[in-house]
Amino acid sequence: MSRSETLFASAQTHIPGGVNSPVRAFRSVGGTPLFLKHAEGAYVIDEDDKRYVDYVGSWGPMILGHSHPQVLDAVRRQLEHGLSYGAPTAMETEMAELVCRLVPSMEMVRMVSSGTEATMSAIRLARGYTGRDAIIKFEGCYHGHSDSLLVKAGSGALTQGVPSSAGVPADFAKHTLTLAYNDLDEVEATLKEKGEQVACIIVEPVAGNMNCVPPAPGFLEGLRRLCDAHGVVLIFDEVMTGFRVALGGAQAYYGVTPDLSTFGKIIGGGMPVGCFGGKRAIMERIAPLGPVYQAGTLSGNPLAMAAGLTTLELISRPGFHDELGAYTSRMLQGLQDRADAAGIPFVTTQVGGMFGLYFSGADDIVTFADVMASDADRFKRFFHLMLEGGVYLAPSAFEAGFTSIAHGDKELAITLDAAERAFAKLK
């Protein structure tokens, strides 16, 4: 019995499902989740001392690779001064100034402790600013686990939301309209009928929670136009894409400016953190300036600020994101070549340093339906074959993968060697 198996059995006694976030349980792929004890560079090491090339990256934050020495040094220096103060710090202001400089749409910013807090607060702010209750989100997009966002589409584009988690009252869900991602016509029709009720549209500019689905040409631009026409606040959820697909996030990559944005993951350098911000006129509605309440005991935690500031400074060097994207492209092309050689229907998607893998014969992946039509059972087999080969992919056919600047030629060779053997066994 492996150490991970022993630990997982023990964990299930006191932790629901043995994990503190559902995807970690390996329910989508089967088997026992890896229990990790160390990480360095492009690698994670499990409790049985096996090393894996890591394409999960703690679900996105580790863009520099694990245990980057300059990030660790920054955290150690802060440790000498205390863990948490519950009071303003100079680093919070420094972080706010840096974020506003890197992301010009962010005229003001509020720090929080998670991406869920950031999206929840941004939606509350949009509702307070507009005086409207309804929100629009998109099928397959995930914005954290707050009640009004755990909603799936009903039996039609204009059907009111239905809770997709037990414990979410129908009265919460009824204000959430869930539409098809990349279907601008559906958004236009919905706003034509209900626009005066809609406070905001929240969207992942690259849908990273149904694998990795880029926006169709004109989709984000169309959302901007429709929001302007109907007085709706446009929120980009950049918890995943922020500072990863480009230094200025997906809004810089695609050239579309939202009213509010949410960030997390990279902004904390691996520490628990998030933020939301945007137009000054909207942000000034937040307490203590305005009537929209938001607060947090650990918001702006100094350890998180130290790690985040150092991370953002390091990824700001010229050429960083070009290098990250180039490695990702080489890796994906290598996977595609080996799948083609084995006669396996396979397609990939990429935006910068995030990517998607699909066992599908489709020419492209554009919609939630395209994702759901891919062969999830074949992905399960591929996942475990890659794991045997020393490569750790996201343990779900519906999650994006992430590269880091620590990935290089050695990691590429390990990855493609494992993939060649895996595809051969999948024939």
From Swiss-Prot:
Keywords: Cytoplasm, Isomerase, Porphyrin biosynthesis, Pyridoxal phosphate. One of its GO terms (biological process) is protoporphyrinogen IX biosynthetic process. It is found in: Cytoplasm. It comes from the Bacteria. PROSITE patterns: AA_TRANSFER_CLASS_3. Transmembrane segments: none annotated. SUPFAM superfamilies: PLP-dependent transferases. The keyword Coiled coil does not apply. Its main location: cytoplasm. The keyword Cytoplasm applies. Its EC number is 5.4.3.8. HAMAP family: HemL_aminotrans_3 (MF_00375). This is Glutamate-1-semialdehyde 2,1-aminomutase. It comes from Stutzerimonas stutzeri (strain A1501) (Pseudomonas stutzeri). The lineage of its organism: Bacteria, Pseudomonadati, Pseudomonadota, Gammaproteobacteria, Pseudomonadales.
